[in-house]
Amino acid sequence: MFRTMMNGKIHRATVTEANLNYVGSITIDSAILEAVDMLPNEKVQIVNNNNGARIETYIIPGEPGSGVICLNGAAARHVQVGDVVIIMSYGMFTSEEAKTHEPKIVVLDEKNHIEMILPEEKAHTTL
């Protein structure tokens, strides 16, 4: 049996752009992607902390160090520039792999630079 587990998480990302006329996806600073082991074209879930919206799309890598978090196409309807979002990727693991899997989690500052790398996410973690 395979289990779907969180593989990477970008916490407290601030939306820098929303481009309705782009074909689709989310553009993410590639330095952030590397830190959480996310790849171009990988499916991600985005949760908007400001309005509660949850959407799925795929990744386009942005300029490293730019701090870009840009929702494109229809996804742009679910955010406004300045909204704080959580971006998560998932992987499928065997039951044995799932027991030892450790997702990569980063917390960003208000300019979308990595502020902290969390070794684990415990119950009732608040920042």
Swiss-Prot record:
The modification Pyruvic acid (Ser) is found at residue 25. It is found in: Cytoplasm. Keywords: Autocatalytic cleavage, Cytoplasm, Decarboxylase, Lyase, Pantothenate biosynthesis, Pyruvate, Schiff base, Zymogen. Its cofactor is pyruvate. Substrate binds at residues 57, 73-75. Transmembrane segments: none annotated. It comes from the Bacteria. Pfam families: Asp_decarbox. The keyword Cytoplasm applies. GO terms for molecular function: aspartate 1-decarboxylase activity. It catalyses: L-aspartate + H(+) = beta-alanine + CO2. Pathway: Cofactor biosynthesis; (R)-pantothenate biosynthesis; beta-alanine from L-aspartate: step 1/1. Is synthesized initially as an inactive proenzyme, which is activated by self-cleavage at a specific serine bond to produce a beta-subunit with a hydroxyl group at its C-terminus and an alpha-subunit with a pyruvoyl group at its N-terminus. GO terms for cellular component: cytosol. Binds 1 pyruvoyl group covalently per subunit. The active site is at 25 (schiff-base intermediate with substrate), 58 (proton donor). Heterooctamer of four alpha and four beta subunits. Catalyzes the pyruvoyl-dependent decarboxylation of aspartate to produce beta-alanine. Belongs to the PanD family. HAMAP family: PanD (MF_00446). This is Aspartate 1-decarboxylase.
